[in-house]
Amino acid sequence: MQHFLPDSESAFEEHPWNWHTPLESKALIIGTFPSALKNRKYNFFYPNPANFFWRIMSEVSDIPLLHFNGEKAVEERKEILSKLKLAVTDIGKTIVRYNGSSLDEKLEVQEFMDIFKILEENSTIEKIIFTSSSGKSSAVSWFLRYLTEKGIHHRFPKGNKPIRSEFIFNERKILLAILYSPSPRAANRITFEKLVEIYRNEILF
């Protein structure tokens, strides 16, 4: 849903899917917010074919990608997540998007997704994996702001990715991992094969 603001260059958007949590999910992938509607090929997470996310998940799960638009693409990707016991969401629940852009830096978060509710409803989740960490409009930056709103102050260690940390939620230790972004703009820093290896190690822990 979009509500255009007085500035015609910006639009208010609500997340169209909230989250998807297969039975007995072990890890939760958190991104920022879906790409602009014009770049979506189907109604599910990472709907922009330019993003490498589903290519990586296909390699990790050994399930080939055969469908790239419509409901069959959605069902195929849900099958991948079920096999990997991998939940997925975005940290932004409502945002303002500027200039119709899909770039994270053109997004301004208004309300965060209820990550704690996801953890409460899915007691098997042991790890949160972040797909972006650069700049103020990233999954990691927004997650840290979300934690602060919940009275938890957390800092990640510095170093090369994957960057690992943890926090305690309702007496549960939740592992945290910051990975390289699967976006094509970030992919020039690392080979696709290395991306697959890193994601595989963090998902199949």
Please provide the spans of the model-predicted regions:
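Short amphipathic alpha-helices and their capping/turn segments at secondary-structure boundaries
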Residues: H15-T21, K72-S82, L119
